[in-house]
UniProtKB/Swiss-Prot annotation:
Complexes and interactors: Part of the 30S ribosomal subunit. Contacts proteins S9 and S11.
Protein's GO biological process: translation
Any one GO cellular component localisation term in the record: small ribosomal subunit
Entry's family note: Belongs to the universal ribosomal protein uS7 family.
Name listed for the protein in its UniProt record: Small ribosomal subunit protein uS7
PROSITE patterns recorded: RIBOSOMAL_S7
Role: One of the primary rRNA binding proteins, it binds directly to 16S rRNA where it nucleates assembly of the head domain of the 30S subunit. Is located at the subunit interface close to the decoding center, probably blocks exit of the E-site tRNA.
Species lineage: Bacteria, Pseudomonadati, Pseudomonadota, Gammaproteobacteria, Enterobacterales
Amino acid sequence: MPRRRVIGQRKILPDPKFGSELLAKFVNILMVDGKKSTAESIVYNALETLAQRSGKTELEAFEIALDNVRPTVEVKSRRVGGSTYQVPVEVRPVRRNALAMRWIVEAARKRGDKSMALRLANELSDAAENKGAAVKKREDVHRMADANKAFAHYRW
C-alpha cells in the first residue's frame, strides 16, 4: 500500500444566489458539456416555480424534495465462495445526497414536459409530495435491501 499522503476531497463553492453547497452540487450534476450558467438558470427557474407552488422558500422546498428521495440503505454485490450475494449496506450521508440528486435529475430528463426547468420543477414537486419516478427509485432500492436482509451478516 502506498505511503503517500491522502488527498482530501475538493471543496465545492456554494452557489451564488442562495449560498448553498448542496444546490451547487445539484447544478453540477445537472450541467451538460460544462455549460454551468445554463444549468444554473434551469435550476433557479425550477426552484422559483416550486416555491410558488409550495408556498415555501426555494431552499426549503428543495430540501423537502431531496429528503423524500434520499435512500437510507442500498445493496452491494459481495462474492462469497463462488456465488454473489446482494448485501444490504447503509448509505453514507454524502452518497445519500449524491444519489438523491442524480435520481431527481435522471427522472426529470425522462419526463415529457416542454422545458427542462418545468420538468425539474414537476419532478421536485412530485418528490416533495412523495410521488414521482425519483421516489419510486428510492422505494425500489429499499425494497431490494429489505428482500436481501438475510445476507446482512456478509457486510464488511
